[in-house]
A protein has these predicted regions:
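FAD/FMN-dependent oxidoreductases across multiple families
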Residues: 245, 271-272, 276-341
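Predominantly flavin-linked oxidoreductase catalytic cores and closely associated redox partners
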Residues: 131-286
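N-terminal FAD cofactor-binding segment of flavoenzymes
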Residues: 45-91
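Glycine-rich FAD pyrophosphate-binding loop
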Residues: 29-50
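Conserved small/polar residues in nucleotide/adenosyl-binding loops
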Residues: 343-350
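N-terminal Rossmann-like FAD-binding beta1-loop-alpha1 element of flavoenzymes
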Residues: 10-35
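A short, basic/flexible loop-to-alpha-helix module at the beginning of a structural domain
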Residues: 1-6, 168, 172
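Short beta-strand to alpha-helix junction loop
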Residues: 107-126, 271-274
Length: 360
């Protein structure tokens, strides 16, 4: 079946921080050289930010580089970190507070902001559209298209209106092909097209195996007297230590008397009976956490896969006609345990030679 096609200079798959920042930077560079470049972003969510789930504490260095006047544009970076606390949870009742004096410098969050990464993406989407980037929410890229020479031609969206047996219903609409000179894949952790490209082009043959975790997060409304806007709490140990498993936890005091609380469980745990969800529920009952949640109300929750292998697990990120970025590739500032601040940071080429091309 012949499908309709659209032509662009660059097609970006995924409207997360990496994809949106790439689109904005491309438009900025084109404007500096008085050139026109057509950029399209495909986003599977119903809107930009719909599939974003993160704590998050964000270093504004990337935003300073991408949009230097972000403070004048009603950005969602409005809650600066006021202080840090770090704990090692020893038992279900006890915890040892790590003195800030001995905390590694990358773990200090002075100058960072507590944000909703979904709101950050929505705001970045507005900045991208102001630069005439075309964003198509509600359309998932279902396959990669190739030229005869094996280079990437673009992507195609999935068909709509097929029955369970694959037959076409009356409402059937075929997918659309989006052709580009360059296609950027920023689908997030374990994106299905990115996995296909890594396998097809053997991008990870010189890399260490990638590591993954699952992150569970809840957003709570808490009483005003328990809220300390800007407080960042990190920790490790119990309850995962009981099963010799590893991971970490966090609690961030955002604005409007809300806190984000979460547990991250490394997916190399050996206990087949371990339930990350149940461990999260236990964690919330620890006195160091429960004291903030008492009398509060959970307003949203979610979970997502996290890539955490770091520099040695990065695959090669460029292929003929395409590029892997963000969590699709596994970029991570391992020292800070952060990924979202990398999307416009200086070229990681300095860190790993030719394995990583310059970031957009």
């Amino acid at each position: 079946m012949q499908r309709e096609s659209m032509e662009y200079d660059v097609v970006i798959v995924g409207a997360g921080p990496a994809g949106l920042a790439t689109a904005i930077k491309l438009k900025q560079l084109a404007a500096e050289k008085d050139q026109e470049v057509s950029v399209c972003i495909l986003e599977k969510g119903s809107e930009v930010g719909a599939h974003i789930l993160s704590g998050a504490v964000m270093d504004p260095v990337a935003m300073d580089e991408l949009i230097p006047d972000w403070k004048d544009k009603e950005s969602p970076l409005t809650t600066p970190v006021s202080r840090d606390e770090m704990y090692f949870f020893t038992t279900e009742k006890k915890a040892i507070k790590w003195p800030n004096l001995f905390m590694p410098k990358p773990m200090h969050n002075k100058g960072n902001y507590i944000v909703s990464l979904g709101n950050v993406c929505r705001w970045l989407g507005e900045q991208a559209e102001a630069l005439e980037v075309e964003i198509f929410p509600g359309f998932a890229a279902s396959e990669v298209l190739f030229h005869d020479d094996g280079s990437i031609k673009g992507v195609a969206t999935g068909d709509m209106g097929r029955a369970e047996d694959g037959s076409e219903k009356e409402s059937f609409e075929s997918g659309i092909e989006l052709h580009a000179k360059y296609t950027v894949f920023s689908e997030g952790c374990r994106g299905h097209l990115g996995k296909q490209l890594i396998e097809k082009f053997e991008l990870d043959k010189d890399s260490d195996p990638q590591h993954y975790a699952i992150g569970l997060k809840e957003l709570w409304d808490i009483p005003e007297e328990l809220h300390e806007q800007g407080l960042v709490v990190h920790g490790a140990g119990w309850p995962l230590s009981e099963s010799a498993s590893t991971g970490g936890c966090f609690l961030y005091h955002a604005e409007n008397n809300q806190v984000s609380v979460g547990l991250i469980v490394d997916l190399n745990y050996s206990n087949p009976h371990l339930s990350p969800y149940d461990e999260f529920q236990r964690f919330k009952h620890h006195p160091k956490i429960a004291k903030y949640l008492a009398g509060g109300k959970r307003v949203s929750y979610g979970a997502r896969a996290i890539v955490k292998g770091g520099l040695n697990s990065l695959p090669k990120m460029s292929v003929p006609g395409g590029l892997l970025i963000g969590c699709n590739a596994g970029t991570l500032n391992f020292a800070k345990i952060k990924g979202c601040l990398l999307y416009t940071s200086p070229s990681p080429r300095d860190q790993r030679g030719s394995r990583m091309p310059s970031s957009a």
